[in-house]
Amino acid sequence: AHSFDQMPMHKVDDEREVIEKCMTVIKDFTGKKPRGWFGPGLTQTYQTLDFLAEAGVEYIGDWVLDDQPVHVNTTSGKSVVALPYNYELHDIVSMAIQHHTSNVFRDRALDYFETIYAESHETSKVMAIAMHPYLSGSPHRIKYVRETFEHVLSKPGVVCWDGEQILDWFLKEQPAPKARKSKKK
């Protein structure tokens, strides 16, 4: 994740080349071309979405959105889906930057969940949680991760999906709009 080299996209010499390199390296290693993109440090330029769409990327996780995916049109007219991403439920932000204890992260996640779970009876919601094994997986923190997921996954209708699964569900529910090229001025 986060590109081939972890550096802001606006500082690379050739953004299109970096994206293509990432896609090629991942496909060569896994045998499968990635469908999604999570860029370095949530950075983008005005051209990033266009380059990603050209490379066949179907969804991004770079935008700090609320709790529902959205279609975003590129200048080519192709739609890319922006999946929710959340800084409030991000272990680096909560524990390493804000210096909260692990139980605060759990409590925050459960409060967030209870709110969107109640709202989800009208429309589906996505609860994005960003976790890093070296941080949340530490022996003094892992029990809070378990408690969080045990509670969340015990509720009817809740699933734990990756980006591709969320994308497939979303496209089934809300197909991409017809491609429209933007008008040049």
Predicted regions and their residues:
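Metal-dependent polysaccharide deacetylase catalytic core of the NodB/CE4 family, i.e.
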Residues: 1-45, 76-78, 84-97, 128, ...
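His/Asp/Glu-enriched short active-site or ligand-binding loop at hydrolase and phosphoryl-transfer sites
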Residues: 4, 53-71, 84-93, 161
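Non-membrane alpha-helical structural segments and their capping/turn regions in soluble enzymes
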Residues: 12-20, 99-110, 139-142, 146
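Alpha-helical scaffolding segments of alpha/beta enzyme cores, especially the outer helices
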Residues: 17, 21-28, 47-54, 111, ...
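Short, solvent-exposed turn/loop segments enriched in Gly/Ser/Thr/Pro and often Arg
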Residues: 37-44, 63-67, 164-165
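C-terminal domain-boundary segment and adjacent tail
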Residues: 59, 110-185
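Alpha-helical scaffolding within the catalytic cores
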Residues: 63-82, 107-116
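Aromatic-anchored helix/helix-loop segment that forms the rim or "lid"
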Residues: 90-122
